[in-house]
Amino acid sequence: EYYLLAGGSHLQKDFGSTVNEIEKDGFQVYRNVDIEMSQDTLFATAKAIGTGILSLSKSLDELRPDFLVVYADRYESFAAMITGTQMNIPTVHIEGGDYTEGGALDDSVRHAMTKLAHLHFTTNQQSSNRILAMGEESWRVNTVGFPVIDLIAEKRYATSDEVVKKLSLDLTRPIILFTQHSVTTEFEDSFAQLKPSLDAIRELSGRGV
């Protein structure tokens, strides 16, 4: 038996209220956890972690679960990990030990969560090695792979025709796939850091791409 707690951006309209997608996939959400994140500032993030701890502690005190599963390294997850360990609930961390290029804040939060967690399920051996190097006992560290690979193996993804239709792609022209990870500690400069990439894409577009 599981109890699913949803919070953070899952509940925010600006991010698509993705809690609805969770329920649409057949998962019952036990409770929506209020983690206030009204602004994109350093103060708001710190406040959201505190709000998350307060909200999550009420739910976990009511549930008294055998263990708590926490995913990745977002601020909501950080709040959940702190709450679980402080309430003496065995915690399981998924995707610990990963490394983000550029010294992003993600690494500090992720590794802090690793030291709070009791069991670790990593996506690759290098991540497991980093956790072991932090002094975690080997029996606590399990290399299980990236969960999304299961969806790919089961072919649970949109077909190429569905992607073309949804994104209105013109297959007679080359396609550019672009992604850029912002430096989380330099969010005020994020547009200036992104602009050269946007200029490059604009230049390519001018050449008929």
Task: Label every model-predicted segment.
Residues 1, 36-138:
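Active-site and donor-binding regions of nucleotide-sugar-utilizing enzymes
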Residues 199-209:
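A conserved nucleotide-sugar
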